Amino acid sequence: MEFNIHRDFSEDTGIRHSKYSETSGEDFYHECLNEVFYECYTKNEILRLELDGGDDGYTPSFLDESIGNLVYDFTLEVVKRLLVVVSTWEPYWIALIEKKTYPKWEDRRLTGKQARITRSHGPWYRLINGTPEKRVWITEVSDI
């Protein structure tokens, strides 16, 4: 499956949290990426996440929040197996994800340090003992 953030989510992306910007990494994860990745997981299909296409690129926090939450909810092993992040314009984004986001969020997952949400979201998928479960996993909205 192919998903281009600028084509399939928003031409303009924001920063990390919903409270501070529209089309944030938090929004992208909860409105799109979690569901699309779950679909790929159930079909054992690769998700090709295209970063190229927009005028302004991304803030590192947008990518960290959205892809980091994916690691937290599906494990680093599963994300590395099923997600291919593509950018011919800015290979730096891919290096940032692989070198910083992946290990940081896998550590958070292993230590149980939940992500923060800055607005309420509907239910989303998370792997529990290898089985996807859909529910609202975080109910406390953060002030940050």
Sequence positions of predicted segments:
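Hydrophobic residues at beta-strand termini and immediately following loops
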Residues: 5
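Active-site cores of enzymes that catalyze phosphoryl transfer or operate on phosphate-rich substrates
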Residues: 2
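Amphipathic alpha-helical interaction surfaces in cytosolic regulatory modules
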Residues: 8-99
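A cross-taxonomic marker for long C-terminal extensions/tails that follow the last structured domain
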Residues: 95, 99-144
